[in-house]
Curated annotation (Swiss-Prot):
It is found in: Cytoplasm. Belongs to the peptidase S51 family. Hydrolyzes dipeptides containing N-terminal aspartate residues. May play a role in allowing the cell to use peptide aspartate to spare carbon otherwise required for the synthesis of the aspartate family of amino acids. Its EC number is 3.4.13.21. Keywords: Cytoplasm, Dipeptidase, Hydrolase, Protease, Serine protease. GO terms for cellular component: cytoplasm. The active site is at S122, D137, H159. GO terms for molecular function: dipeptidase activity; serine-type peptidase activity. This is Peptidase E. InterPro entries: Class_I_gatase-like, Peptidase_S51, Peptidase_S51_dipeptidase-E. SUPFAM superfamilies: Class I glutamine amidotransferase-like. One of its GO terms (biological process) is proteolysis.
């Protein structure tokens, strides 16, 4: 079995319905996976059942059997029993805190490395990398470690945009990621623009969607990556 992981920048593009833009990306991962477990732990400001319902509705045309991990008395067993894993967006720090709390970090990694499909968006993409050190989120809670799932052996920054609002004097996203590369000049960071996604199939990694991604690594800053690019070298 080989890794089959889809990392979406966001759950929406513009004003599109929830997850609708991602259906063409998600569908290939569901061909042999009917029973999915959804992990809503990033959803701090919403009820987990409400969050689950939005995911079920958003993916309804795929006719999947989706349950929330919070509905199961044994989260680890529920994850083992599922054919695939879905992790949604929200607060990355809270998500990782809960994954450690329920002893799921290593288990998710093991299941994905054995071939269980993984689909994440926003925070769910953040935790697929080496660590959550390049998330955009406020650190509202302290997880035991920033170390994440390591499904992708580099850093991710979903919702990437270097827009600076007129009159705003805070750092841009590119400046924040530059700070990371000054502290860690070896580890690459991929900024994924909304509407785009990374898809890992075994030892192959590609960029899907309509917008370029951006590479930050050492002296390389905000290097555009065209859609369709083969990024497999980043898995080495």
């Amino acid at each position: 079995m080989t890794v089959n992981a889809l990392l979406l920048s966001s759950s929406r593009v513009g004003d599109t319905p929830y997850l609708s833009h991602a259906i063409p990306f998600i569908k290939p991962l569901t061909a042999d996976a009917q029973k999915w477990i959804f992990i809503p732990y990033a959803g701090v400001s919403m009820n987990y059942d409400t969050y689950l319902a939005s995911v079920v509705t958003g993916l309804s045309e795929l006719k999947l059997d989706i349950s929330g991990i919070h509905q199961h008395p044994d989260p680890r067993q529920a994850l083992k029993d599922a054919d695939g894993i879905l992790i949604g967006g929200g607060n990355t720090f809270h998500l990782l805190h809960e994954l450690y709390k329920y002893d799921l970090v290593q288990l998710i990694r093991e299941e994905v490395l054995k071939g269980k499909p993984y689909i994440g968006w926003s925070a769910g993409s953040n935790v697929s990398g080496l660590s959550i050190r390049t998330t955009n989120d406020m650190p509202i809670i302290e997880p035991p470690s920033f170390a994440a799932l390591n499904i992708l052996p580099f850093q991710l920054n979903p919702h990437y945009s270097n827009y600076r609002a007129p009159g705003h004097n805070g750092e841009t996203r590119a400046q924040r990621l530059l700070e990371f590369t000054r502290v860690d000049p070896i580890t690459p960071v991929i900024g994924i623009v909304e509407g785009s996604a990374l898809w890992r199939q075994g030892e192959t990694l590609s960029l899907l969607g309509e917008n370029p991604a951006y590479l930050f690594c050492g002296e390389q800053q905000e290097i555009p990556i065209p859609v369709g690019s083969d990024l497999s070298h980043l898995l080495k």
